[in-house]
Design a protein with these regions (language model features):
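Membrane-interface anchoring segments and C-terminal beta-barrel signals
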Residues: 34, 69-169
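Surface-exposed, extracytoplasmic segments of Gram-negative outer-membrane nutrient-acquisition systems
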Residues: 1-26, 43-101
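Outer-membrane beta-barrel pore domains and translocons
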Residues: 38, 49-51, 130-134
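Long hydrophobic segments that form regular secondary structure
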Residues: 24, 28, 33-42
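Repeated loop/turn-to-beta-strand initiation elements of outer-membrane beta-barrel proteins
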Residues: 41-44, 117-118
Length: 169
């Protein structure tokens, strides 16, 4: 019911000589893509950003109750997670390292423009709906795979999704 560590130096004991570099918080590449389309009086824009090839240490998953039903027990010794233990030493291992790659729909806007007479104060009125942080495509188990340069995710609140309805006059 405990984690197993590899004796890398084959000395017969697990000690500081068995440590090695696990993962890399630096992405192999980052990308973004913006698309703007207009058709008649409709306009649509969408902006994607993504990060690929980085690793994230998910510290929020150390002893989480949401997976306690998948923990090792005497009755079921083949479960995915080790037994619950409040006194476990949390030596880092690849157990907590996850792929931090993601693609996010950062912003999306849909608008409609109503042309007005040129004699009026305004030439046209545009109504729009905008959403920030619409969706994130990722295999990461935490709320948000976009972490700082340390590559450590400690939990916290997820990014907010913000809806805006407006008019340009």
């Amino acid at each position: 019911g405990e984690y197993k560590y590899v004796d890398l130096d084959e000395s017969g004991t697990i000690d500081e000589n068995d440590r090695c570099i696990i993962g890399d918080p630096n992405p192999d590449w980052t990308s973004s893509l913006g698309i703007d389309v207009q058709w008649k009086n409709l306009d649509f824009s969408i902006f994607f950003n993504g990060v690929f090839g980085n690793d994230v240490v998910n510290m929020a998953s150390f002893n989480q109750p949401n997976n306690s039903h998948l923990r090792w027990t005497v009755d079921n010794p083949t479960n995915e997670y080790p037994r619950l233990n409040m006194n476990r030493q949390t030596k880092f291992s690849d157990w907590w390292v996850e792929d931090g790659s993601f693609v996010r729909i950062q912003n999306m806007t849909l608008g409609y423009t109503i042309p007005l007479s040129k004699k009026k104060l305004a030439r046209n009125v545009r109504f729009y709906v905008n959403v920030d942080n619409l969706y994130t495509f990722s295999g990461f188990k935490g709320y948000d795979p976009e972490v700082g340069m340390t590559g450590i995710y400690s939990g916290g609140y997820p990014r907010l999704r913000k809806w805006t309805i407006g008019a340009d006059i």
